[in-house]
Amino acid sequence: MSEPLLTVADSLKDRARAALGSRNLILVGLMGAGKSAVGRIVASQLGIPFIDSDHEIERVSRMTIPELFAAYGEDEFRALETRVMKRLLKGGPRVVSTGGGAFINERTRRHIIKGGVSVWLKADLDVLWERVNKRDNRPLLKTENPKQTLEGLMNARYPIYAQADLTVLSRDVRKEIMADEVLKAMIEAQKESAAS
């Protein structure tokens, strides 16, 4: 009896898993970029755990993100986020989705860079707005003109997100396609690293 042939999908997963090794894969980007949705699929494809850092922050604080912002302000929230990210990134491999501001905080960014492979899910304003406009749980968008606020966040944060190890364009396609593109970006980065 012959061995079953590997499918292209199996091969992609195996090569991406080998490229990751024992490191963490950390997804960064603005709210609505798809970090959690894509992260869950990537983790499943790689056969490693997925952790949403915002959910972990809510678990340890026993408060929602909006409650934390209201009670303690953004600075205290960012300090807690840094502590949680530092702890999450000690183990591995795993896929970690971050809150939109995590990579912007210099201390948190250092932990992310040291803790694994960072992937920026980069989306344009219209894609982000379409996704975040449907929910009312975004503390930073509680303004008179939330779309303009989102654009301001893009302008301020995109140069910092660009420091991530890899960039994958987040657009209006199925999450599974985005997950495959993350895997392909990891494989390509490993090839380039091996060639240099």
UniProtKB/Swiss-Prot annotation:
PROSITE patterns: SHIKIMATE_KINASE. Binds 1 Mg(2+) ion per subunit. This is Shikimate kinase. The lineage of its organism: Bacteria, Pseudomonadati, Pseudomonadota, Alphaproteobacteria, Hyphomicrobiales. The gene is aroK. Keywords: Amino-acid biosynthesis, Aromatic amino acid biosynthesis, ATP-binding, Cytoplasm, Kinase, Magnesium, Metal-binding, Nucleotide-binding, Transferase. Mg(2+) binds at S36. GO terms for cellular component: cytosol. Belongs to the shikimate kinase family.
